[in-house]
Regions:
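Juxta-kinase regulatory segment immediately upstream of eukaryotic protein kinase catalytic domains
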Residues: 1-18
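Protein kinase glycine-rich loop
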Residues: 19-25
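Active-site acidic catalytic loop and adjacent metal/ATP-binding pocket
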Residues: 27-38, 42, 196-246
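ATP-binding pocket architecture of kinase catalytic cores
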Residues: 39-144
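Active-site catalytic-loop/activation-segment of kinase and kinase-like phosphoryl-transfer enzymes
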Residues: 149-202
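Active-site activation/catalytic loop segments of kinase-like enzymes and analogous catalytic loops
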Residues: 245-296, 309-327
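Helical subdomain adjoining the active site within ATP-dependent kinase catalytic cores
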Residues: 318-352
Length: 352
């Protein structure tokens, strides 16, 4: 029987589906979905720079905490040797194997957007996801001593050298340099402004209250019941300890879904329309309101909010996608640059 399936089954199994999730030599990940007719398991086999025994056992511990607040997370099951986590070494490299029960609920991705979105394009589960975030924030979990993939002001793992926001800001300017150099001086000025906002944030960031979060709330990890209610999560491999304000603000921003804000090829229409951008902020504050039903921001978090917002509401991957879409449209390029400058200088939004 193929390894690592043989760690969990002592007879041949014919119902096996293998997912290759590898991302280059430094990130080896394969998932085997196995069903012998008696039990169905998701066996995960991995080796990468952000997974070791300490971290993986931390994932298990955090899953237990999520269960305590009432969220479903599939149980980790022991292998035939009684191990929850197995390590083998090949060519000096450690490979880890663990298995979970196959989820009794479907992911939002599997259910499909036509089922979980309303007529305006809002995700029906967003309010409950935000409320659960507030519960985890209120728990002030402290069992992990590493940052999540949402980390700011530091890299998440090798070979990263910066946080993801900085990576996006630099990539944006590099694209302008290589493709629309007439705008390079303005792009570089925006990058200088971004670095100033980064230093502003550095002065307050590390003193903010923290908790530990799953840190990967996409529709392939969100579990829904038969009525499309949010019930739980899978995949904790990007989890870690984060300032609550960072995690809450980013999820409140990224949890915005409204058809009026997006055009063809996912173009962000609010870059070019102040009324639509005001709608975006209104929806952001609505999401913050759901979080505040279960978590109360401290005075230090409220004071730090404008500083953090100016940083994380600026450059991200979709700005790079956008500049590629509009590179032939001088008017839109200038509007996008104006939008970025406004986000890094605005002082008109406060936490309720």
């Amino acid at each position: 029987m193929e390894y690592p399936i043989s760690l969990y089954y002592d007879t041949e199994v014919s119902d096996v589906k293998t997912l290759d999730l590898c991302r280059g030599d430094d990130d080896y990940r394969k998932v085997h979905i196995v069903d012998d007719g008696h039990r169905k398991l998701v066996i995960k086999y991995l080796s990468n720079t952000f997974s070791d025994r300490r971290r993986i056992e931390g994932w298990f511990a955090l899953m237990n905490e999520y269960r305590k607040i009432g969220l479903y997370c599939p149980n980790v099951v022991p292998n035939l040797n009684g191990e929850l986590l197995h390590c083998d070494t090949k060519d000096g490299r450690d490979y880890y194997t663990y298995a979970e029960e196959y989820s009794i609920y479907e992911t939002a991705e599997h259910i499909g957007k036509d089922k979980y979105k309303d007529e305006q394009g809002h995700d029906c589960f967003t309010p409950d996801v935000m409320r659960s975030l507030g519960k985890i924030a209120s728990a002030k979990l402290d069992m992990l001593d590493w940052a999540s993939a949402y980390c700011l002001l530091e890299p998440f793992c090798a070979p990263d050298t910066t946080d993801e926001a900085t990576e996006c800001a630099v990539a944006f300017v590099n694209y302008v340099r290589d493709n629309i150099p007439a705008y390079l001086s303005r792009a570089e000025a925006l990058l200088d402004m971004f670095y100033k906002r980064q230093e502003d944030l550095r002065k307050v960031y590390h003193s903010l209250p923290t908790s530990c979060f799953q840190a990967d709330l996409n529709d392939s990890n969100i579990l829904l019941d038969s009525n499309n209610n949010f019930v739980g999560l899978i995949d904790f491999n990007l989890c870690g300890k984060e300032p609550i304000l960072n995690y809450a603000v980013r999820e409140a921003l990224w949890g915005i879904s409204d058809n009026r804000l997006f055009g063809e090829k996912d173009s962000r229409l609010y870059f070019y329309d102040e009324e639509l951008d005001n709608l975006r902020i209104s929806l952001f504050l609505e999401n913050i309101g759901y979080i505040q039903e279960t978590y109360h921001f401290s005075s230090s978090e409220k004071d730090a909010f404008p500083i953090l917002f100016r940083y994380i509401n600026s450059f991200w991957w979709f700005h790079i996608d956008e500049i590629k879409l509009i590179k032939e449209d001088d008017n839109k390029i200038n509007q996008l640059f104006d939008w970025l400058e406004r986000q890094m200088t605005r002082d008109d939004i406060r936490l309720p």
